[in-house]
A protein has these predicted regions:
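Catalytic cores of RNA-modifying enzymes
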Residues: 1-195, 238-241, 248-252
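C-terminal lobe and adjacent flexible extensions of AdoMet/dcAdoMet transferase-like proteins
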Residues: 175, 193-252
């Protein structure tokens, strides 16, 4: 691994003694070693049996290191802590699990102080995208609903061995301490955003038909002639809350 890139990532994380870190997919410990050396307490989740064995052996004498062998998508952060904003999450997420892993972690976002990930550059571009960008979509809206997104820097393909074929990037996600635009029903918001972006080239009036149904469309706070990529995160929250209220009124 490229020592310069490792140093840069560690500087971005800036781990401190006494902090509680969770590393996902530590692999051969390129980040794990400097994270442990920082004096922080480190839990790691590793799925690969051989790598887990190597990590367990390498860190056998370190009482601040705990290995959890298994799938991060089944890992419950509440087994580590009940304290709000107490865990810092770090990981090099493979492309095929990056989106499900982010959504899984966001289910426990109240426990998380911040998250720093290495992801494929195109995933980071989607996370950081704003309305009217080609990359703006479901992932952008839902992650930005929960977190501020900071695109830190790119990592060239040659920085890691074996070299991935694509450029990666480092991103920091910080859960909002106070969400000014709060969804009354976060499951409804999630369904709304998924439904909208499943047909992103259509107008909202067309792609949201299954959600709006017989509700009074004139009472909705957004222009239904717009397309899904034109709405901000706050627009989606307002729209979701309006649908929530209209559904509630319709059942009274």
């Amino acid at each position: 691994h490229d020592a310069h890139i490792i140093r840069k990532i560690i500087q971005a994380i800036a781990p401190q003694p006494g902090q509680h870190l969770l590393e996902i997919g530590p692999g051969q410990g390129a980040l794990t070693i400097p994270l442990v050396n920082s004096g922080a307490t480190l839990d790691v989740v590793e799925l690969d049996r051989d790598l887990a064995g190597w990590l367990q052996h390498h860190f056998a004498d370190c009482e601040r290191f705990t290995l959890h062998m298994g799938d991060v998508l089944k890992f419950d952060l509440h087994t580590l802590t009940q304290l709000p904003r107490s865990i810092r999450v770090i990981g090099n997420l493979p492309y095929n699990i990056s989106t499900p892993c982010l959504f899984h972690l966001l289910e426990s976002e109240a426990l998380i102080d911040d998250m720093t990930f290495m992801l494929q550059k195109e995933v980071v571009q989607r996370l950081a995208a704003t309305p009217d960008d080609d990359e703006y979509g479901r992932l952008s809206v839902m992650v930005q609903y929960f977190c501020s997104v900071e695109y830190l820097f790119d990592v060239p393909p040659g920085a890691f061995k074996p070299a991935p074929k694509v450029t990666s990037a480092i991103v920091r996600l910080v859960p909002h301490r106070h969400t000014k635009d709060q969804a009354m029903d976060s499951t409804l918001l999630r369904d709304l955003v998924r439904t909208a972006f499943s047909q992103r080239r259509k107008t909202l009036r067309n792609c949201l038909k299954p959600m709006i149904g017989d509700l009074d469309a004139s009472a909705l706070p957004v222009d239904l002639a717009l397309r899904p990529e034109n709405l901000t995160v706050a627009d989606y929250v307002r729209l979701s809350n309006a649908i929530c209220r209209l559904r509630h009124d319709a059942t009274r």
